[in-house]
């Protein structure tokens, strides 16, 4: 009975994609995506299909078996529900591989970097370009995680419009989603095999069976949440600090909680985790600025609303922070919001504003200055912990 119950739960997490979804997946995999080089390095024109096939074949040539390849994140959500409110930001690809030692991590990195040589324009002398040079030119972010529960690496390829191509190589990972609507993964192997073996173009009457999985556990429930813009999760205590930023992003896109009572507990968890993972004001500033750059690159008008929602959540749900440190974080969010308005020319830049005011009657000193010239915001240079343990 236990085995049957486990099988039922596993089956609930999978679903077969219909033709409309397979067609959108094909478009995502074959769309040309520019990878912008720094300095004088040329832009690479790639498709996800080509980069996956190149990296996979080179990994297997190097002795690293790829168990499967999946499309993850907002791109997977876009394939399943076209107008879901999340858009299609980073193009996340997951390669399931074994990473038992440091040598495999290094080999994966070198394989990906050398694979980029295939996409350099004709006429470029590839013999003089090293993996280190390619990393400096095209890699936006390089991450390696090795803990008791997580063994994975991430290589993010730069795109100036915020549509980075992210290649994630996973041996094990404790949690692969934050909310039900971002829990989807689409297994690409059958479609990649079709590209390799079929001489006929893909069509409604001639296409492979493609399987999707929800790491949330119930595919149909998560799919309903995505269609109806609902916010739900499981085991919120496991969500990392970035979950607060993702939650505020969902709210600004008109997603709403499935349970108004539970969401207050969730907000407190996320605020506490944010301040644990980003304990000083400089880290918080860097995280917020990077998040805005990566997730609102083409949505300037939404930045201010997003920051105001984030400020409200932090103000109402922070319970593990000392008063002055909470105010410091709220002030940081307000300053970022002010900067956003200034960049949009909705108000003048606060660094160049002259603020006039009428002095109080008791100000009779002839040397009293009746105006104040605003100075640039203070740069926080003394990082220190801004959270207290929850009892």
Curated annotation (Swiss-Prot):
* Pfam families reported for this sequence: NTP_transf_7
UniProt catalytic activity: RNA(n) + ATP = RNA(n)-3'-adenine ribonucleotide + diphosphate
Give an example GO cellular component term for this record.
centrosome
TM spans (from-to): none
The UniProt function text for this chain reads: Catalyzes the transfer of one adenosine molecule from an ATP to an mRNA poly(A) tail bearing a 3'-OH terminal group and enhances mRNA stability and gene expression. Can also elongate RNA oligos ending with uridine molecule, provided that the sequence is adenosine-rich. Mainly targets mRNAs encoding endoplasmic reticulum-targeted protein.
* Subunit annotation: Interacts with BCCIP and PABPC1; the interaction has no effect on TENT5C poly(A) polymerase function. Interacts with PLK4; this interaction leads to the TENT5C recruitment into the centrosome.
Q: What is this protein called?
A: Terminal nucleotidyltransferase 5C
């Amino acid at each position: 009975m236990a085995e049957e119950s486990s099988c039922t739960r596993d089956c609930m997490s999978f679903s077969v994609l219909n033709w409309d979804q397979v067609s959108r997946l094909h478009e995502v995999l074959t769309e040309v995506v520019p990878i912008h080089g720094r300095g004088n390095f040329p832009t690479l024109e790639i498709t996800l299909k080509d980069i996956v096939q190149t990296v996979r074949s080179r990994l297997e040539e190097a002795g690293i078996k790829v168990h499967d390849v999946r499309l993850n994140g907002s791109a997977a959500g876009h394939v399943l529900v076209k107008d879901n409110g999340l858009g299609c930001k980073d193009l996340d690809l997951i390669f399931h591989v074994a990473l038992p030692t440091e040598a495999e991590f290094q080999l994966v990195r070198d394989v990906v970097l050398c694979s980029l040589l295939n996409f350099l324009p004709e006429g470029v002398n590839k013999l003089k370009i090293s993996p280190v040079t390619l990393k400096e030119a095209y890699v936006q972010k390089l991450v390696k995680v090795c803990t008791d529960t997580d063994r994975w690496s991430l290589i993010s390829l730069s795109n100036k419009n915020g549509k980075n191509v992210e290649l994630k190589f996973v041996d094990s990972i404790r949690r692969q989603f934050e909310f039900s609507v971002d829990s989807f993964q689409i297994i690409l192997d059958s479609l990649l095999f079709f590209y390799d073996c079929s001489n006929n173009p893909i069509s409604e009457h001639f296409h492979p069976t493609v399987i999707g999985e929800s790491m949330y556990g119930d595919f149909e429930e998560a799919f309903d949440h995505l269609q109806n813009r609902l916010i739900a999760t499981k085991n919120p205590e496991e969500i990392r600090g970035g979950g607060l930023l993702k939650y505020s992003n969902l709210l600004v896109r008109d997603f709403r909680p499935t349970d108004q009572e539970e969401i207050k507990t969730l907000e407190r968890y996320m605020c506490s985790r944010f301040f644990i993972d980003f304990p000083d004001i400089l880290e918080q500033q860097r995280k917020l600025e990077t998040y805005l750059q990566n997730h609102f690159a083409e949505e300037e008008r939404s930045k201010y609303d997003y920051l105001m929602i984030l400020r409200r959540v932090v103000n109402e749900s922070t319970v593990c922070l000392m008063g002055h440190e909470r105010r410091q974080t709220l002030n940081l969010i307000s300053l970022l919001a002010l900067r956003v308005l200034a960049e949009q020319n909705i108000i003048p830049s606060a660094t160049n504003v002259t603020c006039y005011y009428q002095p109080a009657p008791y100000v009779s000193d002839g040397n009293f200055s009746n105006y104040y010239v605003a100075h640039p915001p203070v740069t926080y240079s003394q990082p220190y912990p801004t959270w207290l343990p929850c009892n």
